Amino acid sequence: MLTVSLLVCAMMALTQANDDKILKGTATEAGPVSQRAPPNCPAGWQPLGDRCIYYETTAMTWALAETNCMKLGGHLASIHSQEEHSFIQTLNAGVVWIGGSACLQAGAWTWSDGTPMNFRSWCSTKPDDVLAACCMQMTAAADQCWDDLPCPASHKSVCAMTF
């Protein structure tokens, strides 16, 4: 009985110590994803949630832009929320390639990084859904909506990598 009482007292003391750390903000237990520190992005990249974003100023085709992003450790940017869309808008001084494409099947838009396309910001009459225009760009229009363009066009691009 004495042993059980000692164990209970020890557990209460440890629980109290951990509660004190939480109240003081010194607890080391991992918190939810939204409370994680931003990733340490490579030079030239900017943190956005659990990802790093890079604005590539050299104009190139969609395929070369994707290859370039992969060489840098990422993909052309996928966009999953209005927050991400707005952030990328702040980087964009004109038309840029982002990671959407429908080149395998007209109208079947996917992100090059394989993530689900759960957010959309198409321009009002887009996409055209023709294979000749199967790569996605963010326009230079006021709302910087998405448009489908022929992939051989040369534009700047936005890369993203996840940590």
UniProtKB/Swiss-Prot annotation:
* Annotated localization: Secreted
Q: Which cellular component terms (GO) are annotated to the entry?
A: extracellular region
SS bond partners: C41-C52, C69-C159, C103-C134, C123-C145, C135-C151
Q: Name one Pfam family in it.
A: Lectin_C
Does the record bear Signal in its keywords? yes
Signal peptide limits: 1-17
Functional note: Antifreeze proteins lower the blood freezing point.
Kindly provide the name given to this protein in its UniProt entry.
Type-2 ice-structuring protein
Question: Which parts of the chain are coiled coil?
Answer: none
Give the highest taxon in the source lineage: Eukaryota
Recount the PTM note: The N-terminus is blocked.
Q: Which InterPro entries match?
A: AntifreezeII, C-type_lectin-like, C-type_lectin-like/link_sf, C-type_lectin/snaclec_domain, C-type_lectin_CS, CTDL_fold
Proregion residues are 18-34
Q: Where is the C-type lectin domain?
A: 39-163
Keyword Protein transport assigned: no
Q: Which UniProt keywords apply?
A: Antifreeze protein, Disulfide bond, Lectin, Secreted, Signal
Gene Ontology molecular-function annotations: carbohydrate binding
